[in-house]
């Protein structure tokens, strides 16, 4: 694998289709809070900030997610954690326990029999907690919409913050959904939801 060096950018791996990140997003370049903090530190030598702004900023860079992989979307979710997409570079690290997680990714077909388990796992997560619904089946039943055993959207069981469409959605779509969740947390805050 070679490296491509664009004229005004950093080195990009040759197999990444000319992109160093998804949609050209770099959290350190486009984060207004980070820009304000670094400017204030350069001017005064110290930082003053509201505690909830600081907590919100820290929380967006350290989201812990747990998987609730139910079908083929879980394969794409696993791919998003691998080195090519590397969700951990955005501060989005996996956890095995719901008690240590901030985000739950529901990926795949939710059946009536599995719905109580989904709700139980959601209730075990500490506040503030967020849910990403990944794929057509989790969003609204998808291909199995008319089946007697399928819940037509996981939002009937738990509140969903971000919907990632597709059947199955690509790993890039999930990374984009994670970035949208981080923007939503910055916009709404985390102390009171």
Swiss-Prot record:
Binds 1 [4Fe-4S] cluster. The keyword Iron applies. It is an enzyme of class 7 (translocase). It is a peripheral membrane protein. It catalyses: a quinone + NADH + 5 H(+)(in) = a quinol + NAD(+) + 4 H(+)(out). Its EC number is 7.1.1.-. GO terms for molecular function: 4 iron, 4 sulfur cluster binding; iron ion binding; NADH dehydrogenase (ubiquinone) activity; NADH:ubiquinone reductase (non-electrogenic) activity; quinone binding. One of its GO terms (biological process) is electron transport coupled proton transport. Keywords: 4Fe-4S, Cell inner membrane, Cell membrane, Iron, Iron-sulfur, Membrane, Metal-binding, NAD, Quinone, Translocase, Transport, Ubiquinone. Its main location: membrane. [4Fe-4S] cluster binds at residues 72-73, 137, 167. One of its GO terms (cellular component) is respiratory chain complex I. NDH-1 is composed of 14 different subunits. Subunits NuoB, C, D, E, F, and G constitute the peripheral sector of the complex. Belongs to the complex I 20 kDa subunit family. This is NADH-quinone oxidoreductase subunit B.
